Structure formats: C-alpha cells, structure tokens
Amino acid sequence: MRNLIQNRWLKTGFLLLLVLFVATVAQAAEPLPLPSLNIGVGASSKPSDMAVTIQIFLLLTILSMAPGLLIMMTSFTRIVVVLSFLRTALGTQSAPSNQIILALAMFLTFFIMSPIWNQINQEAYQPWKAQQITQQVAMDKAVAPVRKFMLSQTREKDLALFVSLSKLPRPKNADDIPTLTIIPAFMISELRTAFQIGFLIYIPFIVVDMVVASVLMSMGMMMLPPVMISLPFKILLFVLVDGWGLVISSLVKSFG
C-alpha cells in the first residue's frame, strides 16, 4: 500500500516537472512575428498614382468577368449547346456528365480561338510590353480581332435588330458598330446556329426510336418502354459512325 502511494506521488511530481519545463520553454521561445496589413486612403502628390490604382481596379474587374467573357465573345456557347443536344438525343441522361461537357467545350474553345489569341499577343500585348505602343492603342488592337471573329459569325438580321434596339444612327460600316451591340447579336446568332446543328443531330436518333417503337408494337410489347430498348442501338450507331469525330469536326469547321 505504501509503495502504491509512493508511486502515485512520483508520477504526480514527474507530471508537474514536465508541465513546468514546457511552460519555461514556451516563455523562452521568441514570439512569431505577425504580419500587419494596413489599408487606407491618403492624399497622393502624383496623378500617376491614381491612374495606376484605377488600372489595377479595372484589371481585377476584367479578371472577375473572365468566365462571362469566355461565354459571350468566343465559340463556347455554340459548342456547349450542341454537346448538350447530343447527350439529350442519345438519351444517356448524365453521360457524359456536365463537368466533362464543360471541359470539352472549354478546350475546344481554346483550340478554335487560338489563332485570334496569338494575333492579340503579337499585335497588342508584345508591343505594349516592349513599350512600343500605348495602353489605349494596345486595347484597340486587342479588341479588333475579337470583333472581326464575332462579326464573321453574326447574321446581319441579328446585328440590325440590336442596332435598331440601341437607337443608334445607321452605321456606315462595321467599325461604327459598338462592341456592346455586337456581343448580344453574336450570342443570338450562336444560339440559332447551335439549334440548327442540334436538329440535324436529333434526326438519326429519332429514326432509331421510331423503328424500335414500331417493332415493339408489332410484337405486342406495349408495356416495354421503347427508350430502354433503343438506347443500346443508338449508342452502337453513334460509335460505328465515329460520332464524336463527326460532331467535333463539324463544330470546328462551322467556324470557318
């Protein structure tokens, strides 16, 4: 009994010494420096400081709008709508998934738009980086290839619609049309073209559905859903004709 009490006291004393040692080491250790961040509004003696601040703010705004610009001013809209039509026509519900469709549409957009982005890099960004042109000139040269691409894919009817809605004077040429007027007209034209391609994609799959439904009715199998039977045949047909290659090549070639 006496040995048990002594062992308990020894354990308690050892724990107290350990706690005191850790506390002493913690006090002796140098405190970690904490970073400080000061945000304030002060007077500036140079007008250029204000200009740089505005430029940074505009740059952050453009970066936050990058997904919207990708959708509005590139081939992304047509591609993602056509791929969605393809999935619906096949009847595969969630295969391929939305993530796969968006990723494929994004990289196809990079592939299609790469000549335009290379032109922007060579004619606008690199000269501006080398301080050969001003920032305003660089912006004008960067917008020009994008405007040319959008105008080449926009119907005159859609363009005339938004020019009339904006109540602007009749433009003499394409350079007189504001970019904010071209963008919605371009998107409407892209949706129209995507729906036309989607209609062509639907036709062979509808034929397969009709044939399967007719066969089931002739066999008296009224209660069996035709979609469940036709799905394997539609997938087989799509694979045999190299459907992915045909759809992707048609999409890329549709942009000329």
Annotate each predicted stretch with a short phrase.
Residues R2-L4, A29-G256:
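Hydrophobic alpha-helical segments and their helix-loop boundaries in membrane
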Residues M1-A29:
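N-terminal secretory/membrane targeting signals
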